[in-house]
Amino acid sequence: MKKFDPSLYFITDSTNYTEEEFLYRVEEALKGGATLLQLREKNKSTREYIDLAEKVHAITKRYNVPLIIDDRVDVALAIDAEGV
């Protein structure tokens, strides 16, 4: 397993953004050097969380940055995230 590098740990919150804006900000954070990303979504249904997590994971994979899912083992397993 690849070691996690928490030197620039980015924790997300999509509450005040459209999905397009949120995904843009995630990608900008990764372009800016984020080394670990935690998806934290407290107000989404399981289906909404999985859908968003799949999109975020596609982006983090392009930058070879691990994705951590906050508090939801089921979501992490559903998308094969790197951690919970």
Give short role names for the model-derived ranges.
Residues 1-84:
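Conserved N-terminal beta1-alpha1 strand-loop-helix module at the mouth
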